[in-house]
């Protein structure tokens, strides 16, 4: 019988496949796939960042403007979208690819009320929304089929090659 164990530790997902009743730990975990979040994922984290100290500054990526911006506060937590300096934020976020399927839904502006589809990374499904007709982002598909085809197999994780002795 095979068992699957999953662990998430500091943005790295460990998935171990093993056998029940094996005599040694080496036999119990015969295969291990390790995944880590793509480097740009922290830039898109929507969770609210809170800072313990209001002294000094930190930087975070503004998904609406597409730029890193300085914010008040240090010793921040709560979300992954915070960096010690503007330089570190720029290095991580400004040139990072942002696949359409990774973007949050953007309803746009206007009164067109166009039915469209977007990929919801939380549920890994294509969902319908009403598009205003102006601006928005590339996570905006004309049909559910186009959304599913574009985002098929999309993941915020990448496989890391590891050799286990």
From Swiss-Prot:
Recorded GO terms, molecular function?
Answer: serine-type endopeptidase inhibitor activity; toxin activity
- Report the residue ranges that make up the BPTI/Kunitz inhibitor domain in this protein: 43-93, 101-151
Q: Which Gene3D superfamilies does the record match to this protein? A: Pancreatic trypsin inhibitor Kunitz domain
Q: Which GO terms describe its cellular component?
A: extracellular region
Glycosylation: which residues? 90, 123, 161
Kindly give the PANTHER family that the UniProt entry links to this protein.
ACP24A4-RELATED (PTHR45938), WAP, KAZAL, IMMUNOGLOBULIN, KUNITZ AND NTR DOMAIN-CONTAINING PROTEIN 2 (PTHR45938:SF7)
Role summary: Anticoagulant protein that modulates blood feeding of ticks on vertebrate species. Inhibits activation of host blood coagulation factor X (F10). Inhibits activity of host coagulation factor VIIa-tissue factor (F7-F3) complex in a factor X/Xa-dependent manner. Prevents interaction between host coagulation factor X and activated factor VIIIa (F8).
- For this entry, the protein name equals Ixolaris
